[in-house]
Amino acid sequence: MEQVKNKKLYTGKVVSDKMDKTITVQVETHRVHRIYGKAVKVSKKFHAHDENNVAKMGDTVTIAEHRPLSKTKKFILVSVDKTAEIV
């Protein structure tokens, strides 16, 4: 994996690995509702570049901002933090 400096890092779960050298990562964050003050889960999906097709569906991964690699890919895979359990 590449060295990444001064880039925003996200940790999320791989929800799709069907594309070649590309994974879809769902990142969950918590926001406070501006009227009710309740913490709300907000999730967003990002496409990330996985050069060696290392990440599999269900893995927990860290991705980092990068220059645009395609129309939708603007992140690269930094590391696979936790592999998914095979059932």
Curated annotation (Swiss-Prot):
Q: Does the keyword Ribosomal protein belong to this entry?
A: yes
Gene3D superfamilies, from UniProt?
Answer: Nucleic acid-binding proteins
A Gene Ontology biological process in which this protein takes part is: translation
GO-annotated cellular components: cytosolic small ribosomal subunit
Provide the GO MF annotations for this entry: rRNA binding; structural constituent of ribosome
Superkingdom of this entry's organism?
Answer: Bacteria
- Record keyword Ribosomal protein present: yes
- Identify one Pfam family in the record: Ribosomal_S17
Write out the entry's keywords from A to Z: Ribonucleoprotein, Ribosomal protein, RNA-binding, rRNA-binding
Where is the signal peptide, in residue numbers? none
Subunit text: Part of the 30S ribosomal subunit.
Q: What does this protein do?
A: One of the primary rRNA binding proteins, it binds specifically to the 5'-end of 16S ribosomal RNA.
Member of which family? Answer: Belongs to the universal ribosomal protein uS17 family.
Listed name of the protein: Small ribosomal subunit protein uS17
User: Which species expresses this protein natively?
Assistant: Acholeplasma laidlawii (strain PG-8A)
The top of its lineage is:
Bacteria, Bacillati, Mycoplasmatota, Mollicutes, Acholeplasmatales
